[in-house]
């Protein structure tokens, strides 16, 4: 099968390595990139220029987008998508001028449609939080193909999932077809994994970041690379690279170690400790911007409005405990957190307070799409979530449509905890997950080791086998 890897960030090296491994297994790999560095690495790995689609700012400026806009309208009608929705999900493109964002989307659509059609792409693999990825999902599916979104399994284990859409809702079925078909070994693994969660163990990437970010040689190196090279040079051709303005004001990832220390006294004044004997709803803020918020809960990206609407729904005598994401301190400024703290009934809890202790004491744990609701379900505690993702499959997790429904959920009869059903559901997720990691090499260099690359290729190969077995044709022309 012909497959395409889409990437605009640091996973690209992993995709190139996995593509080479899949080529050795008889498949043909193609790439869509936005950075010259990644294009050169794909070429150096032996993939010819015809195998790599490079999307650039210059290409969008030069493109005649009249016909492309008409084609986008046809795709919207055929696939039930909205391009404006995609632009707003895209943390980089939504900060651009509206006319430029639409021009870039039209250019990307035309280039992708031609590339996918020319190479008869049957599977697209990528990170669905940007316009090229979201359009590729729609285009490939429109011609009968598949889309796979690799994400770390949100449990304390070295496994990952291949979801079948932009949402972490349904995995590609490469193991047990239903929870009732899981094996005794998978059930035992699920039991052990649940026990690890209820002992307080976190996901690997969260557990590795339990201390405030350090300002040292590594930080200074990243700062120099970001400000002096990427922001000033790479951003000239790559839409998906922060500029100086966005690094300082919008996507403030580089600023978190500085802000964490610069504002230390303010944090001490803002944050509170839980109060013994107090009834409360626990709401954990998402790391932002991130896929779990931008794509899986796009209607609720305004943190203040979400907290205000939860708070106004709660009865007297029940507090709302709001806890900042511990790795996100410095992304949200003190002014925003101060506004949240001043809302009636709200306590802004110290980010370093143990979330598991709060989960076990809370009347209800709420998140937009966060792992904290999954952890609450592992304890059999009442939970709520505002997105259509896999966490709603656990017995004590309630799907809400809006923040102001939290109060009604709190007063509703509690959902029955069905531990055996939950265990089978977790075993089913494990059965359809894969060993290895898809974390960026900058975070986990072992992701590029041959053994892990082989595991990624194994997982994608299973999806290809599944697609081939279903004999779904991929030669139907797309509505482009």
Predicted regions and their residues:
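Short loop/turn segments at strand-loop or loop-helix junctions that form parts
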Residues: 34, 57, 152, 278-290, ...
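A donor-sugar binding/catalytic signature common to diverse glycosyltransferases
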Residues: 124-128, 151, 351-398
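Nucleotide-activated donor-dependent transferases that construct or modify glycoconjugates
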Residues: 1-10, 35, 125, 285-288
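Catalytic donor nucleotide-activated moiety binding site of glycosyltransferases and closely related
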Residues: 89, 95, 307-350
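Active-site donor-nucleotide binding/catalytic segment of nucleotide-sugar enzymes
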Residues: 275-311, 324-327, 431, 435
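Leloir-type glycosyltransferase catalytic cores
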Residues: 171-225, 396-480
